[in-house]
């Protein structure tokens, strides 16, 4: 498979060209086989503490649900997130959104009673499409 081939090639390049060290720039990381922009962003933010806002399908889905991006592309979502949030918060916020999504706003089994962010600020058309026109009753307070 391509993934294992990419990892094999990547490990040889790291040993041969970088003395076994992981490069510390986006450009060098993205030039490696099997490393795209999201992976490079994760390595830079979590490995080296460099501000980055990695966007995968989960982050993209949540920011779209919360009306923080137009949902056109992962690239646009990253630009929107970087514009909306302070750079100093990007690394931590990225993880917080992932953990929130796993716990309260999964792709499948989405429950507005648990997903209080989407229930309050979510994209109304998406909520109506997913839960019906009376979706607001799902989280109405007693």
Pin down the residues of each PLM region:
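Catalytic cores of DNA base-excision repair glycosylases
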Residues: 1-141
